[in-house]
Amino acid sequence: MALLDRAIVRMLPAVPKPVVQQLSRRYIAGPELKDARESVRRLNAQGKMATIDVLGEEITNEDEAAAIVRAYQDVFADIERCGLDSNVSVKLTGLGLNLGYDLCRANLVTVVEDAASRGNFVRVDMEDSSTTDETLRLYRELREAGYDNVGVVLQAYLRRTVADIHVLADLKPNVRLCKGIYVEPPDIAFRDFEAVRANFVKALEELLDVGAYVGIATHDEWLVDEGRRLVSERRLETSEYEFQMLLGVREDLARRLVADGHRLRIYVPFGRHWYAYSLRRLQENPKIAGYIAADTLGRVIPFRNGR
């Protein structure tokens, strides 16, 4: 299937934009804030929480980073005004990380403070491994500065993740644990499917044992079952953890989790730059392209649900 996945990715630039938009409709709320609002309302009506992500092009100057900050402030105002059950997820490159650490830190503080003023929460996404050190450094700095309404993401496929958990343990961190999708060399990330699964379970055990609040982010039903087992063994209340999934993916599994009484948060991306975002994400991991194509065509391809 790897050859098919890569072939699909190579074809994407030649695919008419309306077709790409149709393919991505289930996975992206739409171009405008109102689209995210309606998606979150539907999710809330189904008993699901949300996290909203503002999609943006690669930031090339401070004005573009400032525009992303303002967009998040608009999101917080909309969440509060409409009474939505949602927080936000931010990417540090969108806040100017590649332009300078201090600029990014100042922008993140602005977003986190605005969230705090409205009783909301900010999840700092993890990007490729070139940003891991600065992301974890910034998370620690904000937590030590007294900002408790901020969390971070750890990727189970990175070989360093369990060690990172030990470093963060004193913070009792709020962590989204996911597998990770960026293409990384084998000395940095596990590539074997079962090795990633095993490290996910190990990382989840470590996080729960240090008292972290964990968003168990996966569409892999085996890992969902392992997560349920681990929280049950520790007799955790449902308020002490949550599951997380992407918009439009494994909706059957999402319904079962909610029906069984687990809290579930859905990632809701929106923005006018949906096209560039879609192409970039698919190119970062060709397996996603194959997954979306198979899912859209209603075919069942073994191994796809193990993302």
Residue ranges and their predicted role:
Residues 1-307:
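Positively charged, amphipathic and often flexible ligand-engagement surfaces
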